[in-house]
Amino acid sequence: MVAFVRQTVFLGALVGMGLLSLPLQAEPKLQTETASAPDAFPIRFSYYPALAEKNTDGLDNAGVVILLHGDKGSRINWDKGASTAAGQPTFPAVLQEQGYAVVTVDLRKHGQSVLEGREDPIQNDDYAKMAAGDLKAVKDFLQKEHQEKKLNMGKMAIVGAGFSAPVATAFAEYDWLQKPHDDSPVPAMRTPRGQDVKAIILLSPDAAAGRLQTNKSLVFLNKQNLAFLFFVGKQDGADKGAAKNCFKACAGGTKKAEGRVELLEPDMKDRGTDLLGKAPPLIEIPMLKFLDTHLKKITVPWVDRRSRLDR
């Protein structure tokens, strides 16, 4: 009953703020996909395609949001939402209703992204493979959808939780380091191969995972003027200042970061994806407003991602 009330308040608030329209579809449209990372590791993910009826300006203007799970979690943390009342929409479903394409990922050695018949322990180098391999496979899939004008990969956001925070930021850093195709004498006219991630949300971010360091990537990404939203529960004893350090790494609190970098500290003890479903006005609604401002409403023209030399 409590969960139902929370979700009813959540939906009412979304409609009241113009972030959601009624009626909602009964079930979200989604499909399960498998992609191969560069090392052939199988990566399973759920794909919620952008809906034409929610994108009156065309699907080629639809942003895409990648959702990552936390430690010992899986994409089910997003797809099912343990604290969601029966019959009420999950966070990915709400994003889809808002017009986004959404991907929830099982990072390697989590959920269904495992080698058949094996239960391999996670090694230190796995985290870098998640960032540069698993998420590259997901992005390659999204590029195919982009080329068919089913979304605009130039309007991409990623959400990390716990250990997947450094994975998310490392992926975004790799993305921004991709140089455009050398297919025009005019640099501004060259076809992009990256620099697609425009916004990042981190829930209870870990400072590091293997050799990945969250703040190292954030310092670089902040120079690209990305938008950042950090969450940490005030009663989270495991945080040890990591979220505030992320905020500081992005020059949070300065005039340059005003309106672009934000840290929210709800009075909660939960961590990572466990923050979801407990107090939507403190977690989900700020996330949706952030994405609305820094992803949905930004102008990024759709661009053919093939090199001009191959068209």
Where is each model-derived feature located?
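N-terminal cap/lid segment of alpha/beta-hydrolase-fold proteins
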Residues: 26-59
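Short, surface-exposed "cap/lid" segments of acyl-processing enzymes
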Residues: 52-97
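Cap/lid segment of the alpha/beta-hydrolase catalytic domain
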Residues: 76-84, 107-130
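Conserved alpha/beta-hydrolase
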Residues: 92-116
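Alpha/beta-hydrolase active-site loop
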Residues: 119-149
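Alpha/beta-hydrolase fold nucleophile elbow
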Residues: 149-162
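The feature captures the conserved acid-bearing segment of alpha/beta-hydrolase catalytic domains
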Residues: 182-258
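C-terminal catalytic histidine-bearing segment of alpha/beta-hydrolase fold enzymes
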Residues: 255-311
